[in-house]
């Protein structure tokens, strides 16, 4: 296992340089057998950080360019006697027993590692039948543990309160950047998580496209679209939700469209139950919008979410996913529509699947502001 997200998911440990660089040469987690302890290759400079943090992990460090020394070496001016080994050298040592026996299966995150790394793997392990295990992690991460559910409750609380605070500053003359700064400041003030770097807000025609916040000034006829979240830094968990608001003089067509999207999204959430097919959930929302907007097109109406780095993960709510909804999944249920040059919407909430249906986690921030017109 080479990705920092999945190393953390399995061990609770976060290799620093692997996380910063996303270079698989910095660390690897080896799982030989379910009855054996996992082995983590670490930098010599970081090994002490992980000691005693997880008794189920064996640490095996490699020498780096850092030049780490102990006190005796400094006092006695001892020449270094390094056994220079890389992370991959250590992995090779631990897997040599399999190479000696002939053909065997070797699971590896092919979706994460680089082309040069995989070529090196093939050279070092010529008898290995490489199997991509990337999807196994995404599927495992789709159903949350009780501890993970609480993590998401905390994260959504922080993001929701931040957006609620931001909503109080919506007024004519405010800039996109300034409004987003309110959201970020609230999260920083709380201190538990960080605002997701990709978080965006757009006014008017900017609400219909993927863009960074600008100096655009809010006018009384604008649509407003927020899309963002928070993340748990080196614990990796991330969130994703959206709000779309309309200023008092917004075009009546925008008012009508928002109501259509909102009602469809709310109906989807109310219909969620354990055992329901994702394709059925998609069709429910999609067909409801289509009744009023016959040319509505959309590839999916939501997704799972966990440790990232991407926010949209399996299972996706689309017409082709016939897998079923499971208890303790956390889903982002969204019904967007973007109209180029006119305005855009994304009605999105984070929900927890319960044995009785769905609990909306992002319930604190409003879908409608007090001054908004309703159909």
Predicted regions span which residues?
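Active-site neighborhoods and metal-handling regions in enzymes and metal-associated proteins
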Residues: 1-375
């Amino acid at each position: 296992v080479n990705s920092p997200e999945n190393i953390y998911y399995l061990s609770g440990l976060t290799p620093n340089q692997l996380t910063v660089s996303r270079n698989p040469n910095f660390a690897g987690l080896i799982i030989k057998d379910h009855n054996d302890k996992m082995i983590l290759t670490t930098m010599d400079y970081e090994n002490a950080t992980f000691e005693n943090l997880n008794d189920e992990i064996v640490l095996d460090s490699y020498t780096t360019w850092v030049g780490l020394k102990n006190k005796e070496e400094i006092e006695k001016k001892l020449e270094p006697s390094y056994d220079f080994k890389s992370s991959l050298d250590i992995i090779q040592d631990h897997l040599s027993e399999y190479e000696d026996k002939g053909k065997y299966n070797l699971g590896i995150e092919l979706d994460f590692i680089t082309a040069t790394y995989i070529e090196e793997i093939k050279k070092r392990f010529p008898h290995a039948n490489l199997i991509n295990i990337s999807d196994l992690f995404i599927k495992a991460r789709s159903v949350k543990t009780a501890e993970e559910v609480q993590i998401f409750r905390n994260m959504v609380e922080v993001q929701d309160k931040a957006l609620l605070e931001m909503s109080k500053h919506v007024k004519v003359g405010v800039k996109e950047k300034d409004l987003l700064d309110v959201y970020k400041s609230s999260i920083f003030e709380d201190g538990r998580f960080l605002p997701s770097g990709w978080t965006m807000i757009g006014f008017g025609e900017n609400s219909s496209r993927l863009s960074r916040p600008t100096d655009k000034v809010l006018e009384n006829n604008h649509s407003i679209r927020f899309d963002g979240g928070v993340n748990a830094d080196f614990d990796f968990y991330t969130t994703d939700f959206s709000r779309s608001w309309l200023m008092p003089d917004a075009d009546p067509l925008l008012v009508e469209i928002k109501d259509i999207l909102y009602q469809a999204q709310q109906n989807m959430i109310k219909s969620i139950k354990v055992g329901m097919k994702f394709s059925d959930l998609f069709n429910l929302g999609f067909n409801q919008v289509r009744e009023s907007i016959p040319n509505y097109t959309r590839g999916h109406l939501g997704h799972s979410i966990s440790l990232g780095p991407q926010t949209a993960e399996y299972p996706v709510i689309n017409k082709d996913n016939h897998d079923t909804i499971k208890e303790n999944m956390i889903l982002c249920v969204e019904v967007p529509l973007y109209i180029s040059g006119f305005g855009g919407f994304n009605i999105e909430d984070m929900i927890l699947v319960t044995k009785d249906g769905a609990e909306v986690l992002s319930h604190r921030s409003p879908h409608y502001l007090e001054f908004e017109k309703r159909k």
